[in-house]
A protein has these predicted regions:
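Conserved catalytic motifs of the protein kinase core domain
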Residues: 52, 101, 204-206, 226
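Hydrophobic alpha-helical segments that form the core
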Residues: 273-284
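Short glycine/proline-enriched coil/turn segments at helix->beta-strand junctions
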Residues: 31-32, 51-55, 86, 249-254, ...
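ATP-binding pocket architecture of kinase catalytic cores
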Residues: 35-156
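An alpha-helical support segment within catalytic cores of ATP-dependent transferases
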Residues: 14-34, 110, 124-129, 137-210, ...
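ATP/Mg2+ or Mg2+-diphosphate-binding catalytic cores
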Residues: 2-13, 170-171, 175-177, 258, ...
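Active-site Asp-x-Gly
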Residues: 206-209, 214-272
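Phosphate/pyrophosphate-binding loops and the adjoining catalytic core of nucleotide-dependent enzymes
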Residues: 1-20, 25, 78
């Protein structure tokens, strides 16, 4: 459902900025800081300089530049979210360029990624339900600013969404058909794809998505494991909200849905598109990500039980 990961300048120079340059850039935006306390490159496309354990300079790494990722897009999304204090995200303090390097200055998200700690049982369900409430608020924002921005790729009409779902399902069916040992379900890939497409309603809500609000970008407090918030909106795009269900098990996804529906239930039309999007996501993962295939098949089995 996303643009491909084609790096447009893979041979570009990728300098690590010295501390003096980092401090100078951040101070241009009215931030008082004294030292770079950590440099983080785990995000791949960006390099993050942490200052005084409170602020972040996030720079686009030139060799990792790709069409779907944009710091301008992240700054835009975070600015829109600043009107909603219940949705906890970093606060943008500045966005610009230094020489040929694009950057954002922002506050550091407190806590740690779920991926780095063990969150299980009741605590995991609580985190997922709070994340679901957060995503419902995020998806419920006015969409005109996102639809009107060229920064956000994706599907802006039902016809575009259905065409993309059909094309991606067809590709997944083709790949799985060429390697039949991948498929261990009673229903054939083609029949499952047909059932999913037939269930899509005439009305589909399409909104700006985070893109990957999974364990790597969902933050919790390390001592209590309480939910804190979300980071990294640079891959955002427009499509169906279900494509923001980026968690490893179907039980995780159901808990997230419970939180999503806490204040206002979703419609039958939403649920039909939700199932379709999850089947698409899982069939695509089965076709392209061998390391997750056992888990993906388990999710698909659970999903099949919810399909009429």
């Amino acid at each position: 459902m996303l643009p491909s990961d084609m790096y447009s300048q893979s041979n570009a120079v990728d300098p690590v900025l010295d501390e003096r340059t980092v401090l100078d850039i951040v101070r241009r935006h009215g931030v008082r800081c004294s030292a770079v306390t950590r440099i983080d490159e785990t995000g791949g496309e960006a390099r993050v300089y942490v200052l005084d354990h409170n602020f972040v300079l996030k720079v686009q790494r030139p060799p990792q530049l790709r069409p779907r990722t944009s710091l301008a897009k992240e700054a835009f999304f975070l600015d829109q979210l600043s009107a909603y204090p219940d949705i906890v995200v970093p606060q943008v303090l500045g966005y610009s360029r230094h020489d040929n390097i694009e950057y954002i200055v922002m506050t550091q998200m407190p806590g740690v990624p779920v991926l780095t700690v063990e969150v299980t049982g009741v605590q995991r369900m609580a985190v997922l339900q709070q994340l679901g409430r957060t995503l419902r608020g995020l998806h419920s924002m006015p969409q005109a600013p996102f639809y009107g921005s060229a920064l956000f790729p994706g599907n802006r009409t039902r016809e575009e969404f259905v065409a993309r779902v059909r094309a991606n399902l067809a590709h997944a069916v083709q790949v799985i058909g060429a390697t039949p040992h991948l498929w261990r379900l009673d229903v054939s890939p083609a029949d499952l794809a047909s059932r999913v497409l037939a269930a899509l309603s005439a009305s589909v809500d399409l909104v700006a998505l985070h893109s990957n609000p999974g364990p790597v970008h969902t933050f919790v407090r390390p001592d209590t494991l309480d939910f804190v918030g979300l980071i990294d909106f640079g891959d955002a795009y427009i499509s169906h909200p279900a494509l923001d269900w980026r968690w490893p098990t179907h039980a995780d996804r159901v808990a997230l849905l419970q939180g999503y529906c806490d204040d206002t239930p979703v419609t039958d039309e939403f649920m039909a598109a939700w199932r379709a999007a999850l089947v698409l996501s899982d069939m695509s993962a089965l076709a392209t990500r061998p390391e997750t295939r056992p888990q993906t098949l388990e999710r698909l089995r659970d999903l099949l039980m919810t399909l009429a």
